[in-house]
A protein has these predicted regions:
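Domain-length accessory/inserted modules outside core catalytic folds
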Residues: 1-164
Length: 164
């Protein structure tokens, strides 16, 4: 199976970066534990919602790590962002990440990663600063992957200029 072309890799990494940056903004606006996000109901009570059961409200008062990722982009970009944050979590514990654009994992693996990140977010004593630091680690790794990603040669470049 041939490797994906350079433009596809760059597009996927840029989409991943956009989700990570959007999730960071969501978390800065408000962070929660015990649900994917909190919303204020019509009677003024704050309610936690988790996953698809909570719908996708236009405004939330706060998001957990996974909820912020889910709200920040399209499903394919969100999936890759989940993988990037999961890899950043392991890197923060001294385990090297795969780097670059790893293959898309099976749905069961991604679901396990979502559970792990949800449990990590919800651990007693966890702080918003720790969550933001993890997202920052994923953002930094994604930027480094973008810098190292292959680039397509311009079609009109002279042969001596083309990478080869």
């Amino acid at each position: 199976m041939p490797p994906p072309d350079a433009e596809l890799i760059l597009g996927q990494l840029n989409g991943q970066l956009a989700v990570l940056e959007g999730a960071r903004a969501e978390l800065e606006a408000g962070w929660v534990q015990g649900g994917w996000w909190s919303v204020t109901s019509a009677d003024g009570d704050q309610r936690l919602a988790t996953g698809d059961a909570g719908g996708s409200p236009a405004h939330v008062d706060g998001s957990c790590l996974v909820g912020a990722l889910a709200r920040a982009g399209s499903s394919s970009d969100v999936g890759r962002a989940v993988d990037a944050v999961y890899d950043a979590l392991w890197a923060s514990r001294g385990q090297p990440g795969p780097g670059g654009l790893p293959p898309v994992p099976p749905p069961e693996v991604r679901q396990a990663r979502v559970r792990t990140l949800t449990q990590w977010n919800d651990r007693a004593g966890r702080t918003r600063e720790e969550v933001l630091a993890l997202v920052d680690r994923a953002i930094s790794a994604t930027i480094m992957d973008l810098m190292a990603a292959p680039r397509s040669d311009p079609a009109d470049a002279p042969p001596a200029v083309r990478a080869g």
